[in-house]
């Protein structure tokens, strides 16, 4: 919390073993609202390249960023396109929750393998979901920006209200639409059992 929910890269390094194959990141993050900085992502990319690791990068909240923060996809960094699975979807930025349409960008050999699994696991997304998603991606306009402004207004109000409650605190999230409340000052005793 004290570092804005940035990854502790020394801890990441300490956890890598010869059996480590991948690192999973979520930025903006659920549930903290943290957004990994470009500096952290560059250093993580160096770690991934040096240790021949794949990165699974969940970027479903990429459009929900506040206060001048910038989303950087780790796949855009040198040496990372060929080792990154970028996961995204329509549910968050385009308010299509429950429609179950997502997408992945990854090296071609992995996409081909995914297609073999997918073609026998899923029939297809409903036609209206495909059409709505194409329209959202191709004609994105003021709707997403208006939604982000409204989320920011709600976030600011909720953070202020939470931080005014004795014993509660929270940082102002930089992305997504979650608030991670610190309850460490509340002393809750263990329930007694008969």
Each predicted region: which residue ranges?
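Active-site phosphate-binding strand-loop segment of PLP-dependent enzymes
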Residues: 2-67
């Amino acid at each position: 919390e004290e570092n804005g929910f940035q990854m502790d890269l020394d801890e990441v390094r300490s956890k890598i073993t010869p059996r480590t194959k991948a690192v999973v990141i979520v930025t903006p993050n659920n549930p903290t609202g943290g957004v990994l900085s470009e500096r952290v992502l560059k250093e993580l990319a160096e770690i991934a390249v040096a240790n021949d690791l794949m990165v699974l990068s969940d970027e479903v909240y990429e459009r929900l960023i506040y206060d001048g923060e910038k989303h950087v996809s780790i796949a855009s960094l040198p040496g990372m396109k060929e080792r990154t699975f970028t996961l995204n979807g329509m549910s968050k930025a385009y308010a299509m929750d429950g429609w179950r349409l997502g997408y992945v960008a990854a090296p071609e050999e992995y996409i081909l393998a995914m297609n073999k699994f997918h073609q026998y696991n899923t029939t297809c997304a409903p036609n209206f979901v495909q059409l709505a998603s194409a329209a959202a991606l191709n004609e994105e306009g003021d709707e997403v920006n208006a939604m982000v402004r409204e989320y920011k207004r709600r976030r600011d109000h909720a953070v202020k209200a939470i931080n005014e409650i004795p014993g509660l605190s929270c940082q102002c999230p930089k992305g997504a639409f979650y608030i991670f409340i610190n309850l460490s000052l509340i002393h809750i005793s263990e329930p007694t059992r008969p």
